Amino acid sequence: MGVISIVGILAISALNIITNIYELLKVSLATSEIKDLQKNISGVYNYSGDYEQLFLGDVYKTLCETDKVAPNQMCVKKDSSYVLKHRLSGSVVLGKSDDSKGYTITFGNLSKKNCVKLSQIEWLDRKKISIYQIDINETEVAHFPKKANKEFPITATTSSVACNKKENSITWYFY
């Protein structure tokens, strides 16, 4: 009987380890998705100095089909258009910044743990990234002047306090 108990405990421990590794992989893939989406949108639409042309017509069909800017795994066909989903099974919403010189990307349906991890993404890439604000659950948690930001220092404590719902959302602001 003791051997069976030990084997059971070891099996449960192994299952927990595998589950944690799988969750870390999904967060890593979601991190890649937001970075790839941002990089692709900025690369295609930044030439005119604003992102107004991105929002002409059906933005999701443009991102997934016409310009093929969104990573394929994020594009989910819905009727005659598309919706975007991230690897953590939540929605992805694109929006205009207040002045149309930038855009926002919102990841929805995030657990507290995943919200905290994604809010602390390191945005330094090729010496410059054009992120200037982050909101968690529609509340601004960080804002920087519109200049090249080399890092985005949101502490784990700030993230943990802000990611206080069962389902959280993060909105990143880019220009």
Where are the language model's segments positioned?
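N-terminal alpha-helical signal peptides/signal-anchor transmembrane segments
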Residues: 21, 30-52
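N-terminal single-pass transmembrane signal-anchor helix
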Residues: 1-26, 30-33
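Periplasmic/extracellular, small/polar-rich flexible segments of pilin-like filament-forming proteins
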Residues: 47-175
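Long, contiguous hydrophobic alpha-helical segments, chiefly transmembrane helices and signal peptides
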Residues: 1-2, 37, 118
